[in-house]
């Protein structure tokens, strides 16, 4: 089994819903960060074999491929999108590690992206005239305190003094 290493990590700033980043689509948010992490880690973009991105609030299509095309990655790099609530970005990273360990790829860029400002709008019923923003469904019993993953991450970071 081939060894796998994480050689870089970056994230965007956090912005409130309808805040300063609300005009940017997810590929516009993610592409500069991907370009930056590749450059900072000393990897050449043409060395990247795969891009894996988690996006749970997407409107469909293949956000990962759109991100690959918007970044400096070569056109041959595909885009695999994971649709999973909570820890989808970590799943993308773990899948990238497994691809490297299995020898199916040498360099994988992986992570997650969301834009609550740009989440899809849907009809509650097929012929309903009321538009409803897509919100994450309940995943825990009412007895558990359900918070979004980002909020949980900030609480853990604060508790352990991480910045």
Question: Could you tell me what each predicted segment is?
Answer:
Residues 76-85:
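Short loop-beta-helix segment that forms the pyridoxal 5′-phosphate
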Residues 1-77, 113-163:
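Conserved "HGTGT" condensation-loop signature of ketosynthase/thiolase-family condensing enzymes
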Residues 84-114, 157-163:
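Active-site-proximal alpha-helical scaffold in enzymes
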Residues 50-52, 81, 108:
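Short, conserved beta-strand segments within well-ordered enzyme catalytic domains
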Residues 64, 79, 90-93:
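Generic internal hydrophobic packing segments that stabilize the cores of diverse globular domains
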């Amino acid at each position: 089994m081939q060894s796998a290493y994480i050689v870089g990590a970056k994230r965007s700033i956090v912005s409130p819903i309808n805040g300063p980043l609300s005009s940017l689509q997810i590929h516009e948010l993610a592409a500069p960060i991907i370009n930056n992490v590749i450059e900072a880690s000393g990897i050449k973009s043409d060395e990247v074999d795969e891009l894996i991105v988690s996006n749970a609030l997407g409107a469909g299509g293949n956000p990962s491929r759109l991100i690959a095309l918007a970044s400096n990655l070569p056109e041959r790099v595909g885009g695999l999108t994971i649709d999973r609530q909570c820890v989808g970005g970590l799943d993308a990273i773990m899948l990238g590690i497994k691809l490297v360990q299995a020898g199916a790829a040498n360099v994988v860029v992986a992570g997650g992206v969301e834009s609550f400002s740009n989440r899809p709008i849907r009809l509650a019923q097929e012929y309903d005239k009321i538009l409803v923003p897509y919100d994450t469904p309940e995943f825990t019993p009412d007895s558990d305190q359900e918070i979004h993953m980002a909020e949980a991450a900030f609480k853990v970071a604060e508790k352990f003094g991480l910045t």
